[in-house]
A protein has these predicted regions:
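A structural "domain/chain start" motif
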Residues: 2-11, 15-59, 159-161
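Short, solvent-exposed, polar/charged sequence segments at loop or secondary-structure edges
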Residues: 46-86
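Sec/Tat-exported extracytoplasmic proteins
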Residues: 54-58, 101-105, 150-159
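C-terminal/domain-edge helix-coil "capping" segments
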Residues: 130-161
């Protein structure tokens, strides 16, 4: 009797967790059909985020790979959305980064002159500059993760021979 009650409670709790969006870490990680890739990029926080995303997607980074990913430098731009002189101001932060994908054997472009773009809106306080800078930096870190995920999605759609 006690065992069936415990099993029933366990089933109800797992259903409740799944219903509220709880997922085990790594369960729905994207996987790429590209087993190996040569990453050609300057060392930067964005290129490191892309490297991490590729490795998490099951792609090994190797200089001898058949496919080369050319990743340009990220560009961060900010656009003020509100015009108040004091207090808080709403700002749109946008990250853009160019990339292309080439075959190593003949340098043919599989994806040429592509652009990654991710943006978010943040509320920056003019009263507390430190917290505003922290909010901005966290937004940029999230944009890097979003752009890396966007790149994984584009590479996943790529048909490679």
């Amino acid at each position: 009797m006690r065992r069936t009650v415990l099993a029933g409670l366990m089933a109800v709790s797992l259903t409740a967790l799944a219903g509220c969006g709880f997922q085990l870490r790594g369960l729905n990680q994207p996987t790429l059909a590209i087993p190996e890739l040569n990453l050609n990029a300057n060392v930067s926080p964005f290129s490191e985020e892309v490297r991490r995303a590729l490795e998490n997607a099951g792609t090994r980074i190797s200089e001898t790979a058949d496919i080369r990913l050319n990743l340009g430098d990220e560009r961060i731009s900010e656009n003020r959305l509100t015009r108040s002189d004091s207090g808080s101001r709403e700002t749109e932060v946008t990250l853009t980064a160019p990339f292309s994908v080439q075959r190593e054997s003949d340098d043919a472009y599989l994806l040429n002159q592509q652009q990654l773009e991710a943006s978010t809106t943040v509320l920056l306080s003019t009263d507390d500059i430190y917290s505003g800078e922290e909010v901005r930096n966290e937004a940029i870190r999230q944009l890097r993760r979003d752009a890396a995920t966007q790149l994984i999605d584009r590479l996943d759609a790529l048909e490679t021979p």
